[in-house]
């Protein structure tokens, strides 16, 4: 086994992962890293109780593991270790960025500040972390009550994710907030070529027939909130998938910044939202396993890679599946240095349940 792909164990307070720490976990049976778009980023490792370093593996320790084909090795803090079963324990680790779930942010408010400055301010409570973003447009931002840093980043009303959207990338102690993390790769995963397994799931819970937009603001000189809605109340969403009325109620308050909130402006933003989001159509989630062509000798010159948030094409002629969609989840086999599976479609989780906890 190549030493560079074997997970390494570190003490709980480690911040420099360039050494071999407490030891290289050469007896590791399996190690998988799962990452979701703006969601879960975890490591699952199986290790024998007879392994050389078993006695050193405790909760809060850190495991360094390879998360995908292109990124640097990432640090995962152990939060759960199962009881031995047939002489093997299962070790669960969360990405080191989950430490930010326990770093508090006190209430503050700003009328207009760049996202880079806001990100730096939020991360100031833990000097191990730094932030980067390619967003530049300033917006009003506030924290009304004490929250964790991760809750301020995403998963709660008024978070950075809810204001700028985008996609987070967690690179050890660097928090990267991309406007678009992935790219349109041109990669095709096809039956008869490199597709080994496919599962398609269609969920219409995100399909609606109408959108009811509203926005709330407090007029200058008053303490009373004003709610702006449309005279027609809702805007229609074209769909042929459901016959019953199903309305999406959505708050657009965060989308105005310093601009005046009017019926006309609200209608324009709501129509833009309908146009940009497939609210009237089921977008299937496709989970596939495949053989990376770039790891096969005859295709070694290929520069193709599949990473989280990339757009790829899946084709299976026998099942009639042909879809181009965003990669929303990757499961990576660290020891084999290969992507075990990817999921394409709409985000299956959000930072509401995974970041703000």
Specify the residue positions occupied by each region the protein language model found:
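Short, surface-exposed beta-strand/loop "edge" segments at domain boundaries and coil↔beta transitions
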Residues: 16-19, 51-55, 70-73, 98-102, ...
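Extended Gly/Ser/Thr-rich low-complexity repeat segments
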Residues: 53-68, 101-111, 186-195, 302-310, ...
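Surface-exposed loop/turn motifs at beta-strand-loop junctions within extracellular Ig-like
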Residues: 69, 164, 316-318
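Charged- and aromatic-enriched interaction segments used to assemble
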Residues: 85-88, 92-206, 324
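An acidic/polar, Gly/Ser/Thr-rich interaction patch typically located in mid-to-C-terminal regions
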Residues: 29-55, 196-356
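Short polybasic amphipathic segments
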Residues: 2-16, 175-177, 211-214, 312
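Beta-strand-rich assembly/attachment modules of structural machines
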Residues: 1-120, 130
